[in-house]
Amino acid sequence: MDIEYLEEESDISICEKVEIISDQESVEESIEMDTTSSMFYDSFISDTSVSDSYNQDTLNYYRLRGEKFMIGDYWPNQKHMTPSMRSILVHWIFETFDAYDFPTEAFFHSVKLFDLYLEKNCVEKNQLQLISIVTLLIASKFDNRRNILTSEISYISHNAYKMEEVIMKEREVLEYFNFDISFPTAIHFLHHFANGTFCDKYTYMLSCYILEMSMLGYELVSVKDSIKAAASLLMALKIKQLEWTELHINVSGYEEADLTITMWKLNAVIKNKSINRYCSAIKEKYKKRINLNIFESEDFPKNTMTKEND
């Protein structure tokens, strides 16, 4: 099964398919709060009752745990996937989770599982979407109270694979990871960086947008999640003409100079015309009022940067 059809407009969108499923079944409403929404900011990021020591202990644990799940440059080993194919599949994962109103952690978790698996396994072209489906299923079970059913996945993915194929591949992927699939992602680091530095709501939301867009580009796959998170916050601060202060250094553990290269990579991904073909769902998310209309704000065209020597 090819993945090209994902580029084309379907007669019915994923959101509409999910609505049909919800109408057909008694679906329990999810109680999870989207961690890249302004409501999450109000309940956690701006919560000054979270102690500095707790925040730092959590970050130390994340860094230690994250070292075990670093992703190398796997592109030379993947003979059947192009950068645009990966962008399409990652966007499909995002669009599906967004349609289900699942927390953003599930999206980051799924994409990292996808990349970790591809790092060590050469996958045929007709199996690439199956891997994305399986990692999506695993993340939905791990990060959400209600997981996506296999039968639902078959429907919203145009019946690309039989249920038996999905179940068998899910078992294979879990066994490959030895069922050890609990790890921090870039969004976890961003939460704690933002909380520890008293980040304002708009800057936090802009950082989330930058970080989510970065997932579409392969260029940042092998960059540490803590660096990606800190660089997205730095980029948002620069756009807002704010500074990377001593507090940011103490909380994140990074000097501005440590993040500059990654920040410009983030900027390049967001400006990439090819990647922008596959990010409609992310842009729609940040047009919503709950997300401060980030994408429709008057200064949004300025939300990328140009090097002085460009």
Name every feature range the model reports, one short phrase each.
Residues M1-I133, L137-D310:
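Acidic, serine/threonine-rich low-complexity regulatory regions at protein termini
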